[in-house]
């Protein structure tokens, strides 16, 4: 399975959070949004300019800027959840 930064994951793909490489304060905030190692994430859509992007975690849609998402690493489990 591929591991990639969440910001690089294709729209329609899904995976499991492998790790988060951010300062504790930011990681703590992301944990409250559902971004924890082992959590399933779907990449739903991106803004027309590419940033921010919307992800689904436990049935909740969450928007993140790429500058944050580039530090969250995802183990890809599905290339396109629409198929």
Where in this protein do the model-derived segments appear?
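Short, structured beta-strand/loop micro-motifs enriched in basic residues and often containing a Trp
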Residues: 13-26, 75
């Amino acid at each position: 399975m591929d591991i990639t930064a969440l910001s690089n994951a294709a729209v329609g793909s899904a995976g499991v959070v492998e790790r988060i490489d951010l300062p504790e304060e930011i990681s703590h905030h992301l944990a409250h949004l559902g971004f924890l190692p082992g959590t399933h994430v779907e990449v739903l859509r991106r803004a027309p300019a590419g940033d921010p992007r919307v992800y689904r975690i436990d049935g909740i849609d969450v928007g993140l800027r790429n500058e944050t998402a580039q530090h969250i690493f995802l183990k890809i489990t599905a290339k396109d959840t629409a198929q």
